[in-house]
C-alpha cells in the first residue's frame, strides 16, 4: 500500500475515532449505541491504545455486551494484543464475520500487526524458522517467504530458515512494500519453535518498556 494511501487511511481512522468518542460523550445517559462502542473499541486497538480499550470495555454495559457478540469478538482480539500473541491476533480476526462498520478497522489492524511483526523480526533475528516466521506475520509459509525475498531478505529451502536483514533507521512505520533493509547479518543456529515465538514476545515487551 502506498505511503500516501496509508496516511489518508490513518487520517480517516483518526477522524472516525474522534467522532466515536464525541458520540459516546454526547449519548443520552452516557450510553452509546452498540455500533459506536464496536467502532471505538476496534479503533483503540488499531491505535494500540490498550489503556483506553480496557477502560471502554469495562464501562460498556453488560446488557449491551451480552446482546452484541461482536463486541466480545473485538475484545478477544484485544486480549491477544495484550498478550502479545501475534499468531492469535490473526486467527481471532479471521475467525469472526465482522459488521460493515467494523470490518475495515479490523482489516487495517491485521495489516498493521503484520507490518509490525515484519519489522520486529528484522530487528530481533538473524535467522528464524520459516514456519515460525509465517505464523508471526499471519501468512502462508510460501507467501511469507516470497514477501521477504522481495524485501532483500534471504531464505534457505534446505534448512527452511529465513535470514532477515536489519532495517534502515526510521523505517519501522512505513509501508512494508517500501521497507528496504540495509545490512546483511550472519546466520546463527536456530532455536526451537516455541522458544523462538517466546523470544519474539519478550522482544516486543522490551521495545515497549
Swiss-Prot record:
Top-level taxonomic group: Eukaryota
Residue stretches making up the PCI domain:
8-179
Q: Which UniProt keywords apply?
A: Cytoplasm, Nucleus, Phosphoprotein, Signalosome
- Matches recorded under Gene3D superfamilies: 1.25.40.990
**Where is the protein found, in the record's own terms?**
Cytoplasm; Nucleus
Gene Ontology cellular component annotations, sorted alphabetically: COP9 signalosome; cytosol; nucleoplasm; nucleus; perinuclear region of cytoplasm
Q: In which tissues is it expressed?
A: Widely expressed.
UniProt-listed GO biological process terms: COP9 signalosome assembly; negative regulation of cell population proliferation; protein deneddylation
The positions making up the signal sequence are: none
Is the Phosphoprotein keyword given for this protein? yes
Which residues in this protein are found as Phosphoserine?
175
The cross-references to Pfam families, in alphabetical order and at most eight, read: CSN8_PSD8_EIF3K
What family does the database annotate? Belongs to the CSN8 family.
Function, in words: Component of the COP9 signalosome complex (CSN), a complex involved in various cellular and developmental processes. The CSN complex is an essential regulator of the ubiquitin (Ubl) conjugation pathway by mediating the deneddylation of the cullin subunits of SCF-type E3 ligase complexes, leading to decrease the Ubl ligase activity of SCF-type complexes such as SCF, CSA or DDB2. The complex is also involved in phosphorylation of p53/TP53, c-jun/JUN, IkappaBalpha/NFKBIA, ITPK1 and IRF8/ICSBP, possibly via its association with CK2 and PKD kinases.
**Subunit record text:** Component of the CSN complex, composed of COPS1/GPS1, COPS2, COPS3, COPS4, COPS5, COPS6, COPS7 (COPS7A or COPS7B), COPS8 and COPS9. In the complex, it probably interacts directly with COPS3, COPS4 and COPS7 (COPS7A or COPS7B).
Protein name per Swiss-Prot or TrEMBL = COP9 signalosome complex subunit 8
Species: Mus musculus
Amino acid at each position: 500500500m502506498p505511503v500516501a494511501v496509508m496516511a489518508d487511511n490513518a487520517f480517516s481512522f483518526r477522524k472516525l475515532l474522534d467522532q466515536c468518542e464525541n458520540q459516546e460523550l454526547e449519548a443520552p445517559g452516557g450510553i452509546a449505541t452498540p455500533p459506536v462502542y464496536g467502532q471505538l473499541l476496534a479503533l483503540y486497538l488499531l491505535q494500540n491504545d490498550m489503556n483506553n480499550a480496557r477502560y471502554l470495555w469495562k464501562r460498556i454495559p453488560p446488557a449491551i455486551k451480552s446482546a452484541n457478540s461482536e463486541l466480545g469478538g473485538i475484545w478477544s482480539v484485544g486480549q491477544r494484543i495484550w498478550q502479545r500473541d501475534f499468531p492469535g491476533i490473526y486467527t481471532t480476526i479471521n475467525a469472526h464475520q465482522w459488521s460493515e462498520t467494523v470490518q475495515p478497522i479490523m482489516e487495517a489492524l491485521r495489516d498493521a500487526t503484520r507490518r509490525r511483526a515484519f519489522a520486529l523480526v528484522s530487528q530481533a533475528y538473524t535467522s528464524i524458522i520459516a514456519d515460525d516466521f509465517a505464523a508471526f506475520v499471519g501468512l502462508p509459509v510460501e507467501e511469507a517467504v516470497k514477501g521477504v525475498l522481495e524485501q532483500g531478505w534471504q531464505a534457505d529451502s534446505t534448512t527452511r530458515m529465513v535470514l532477515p536483514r536489519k532495517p534502515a533507521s526510521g523505517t519501522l512505520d512505513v509501508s512494508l512494500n517500501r521497507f528496504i533493509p540495509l545490512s546483511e547479518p550472519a546466520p546463527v543456529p536456530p532455536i526451537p519453535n516455541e522458544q523462538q515465538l517466546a523470544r519474539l514476545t519478550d522482544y516486543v515487551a522490551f521495545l515497549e518498556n
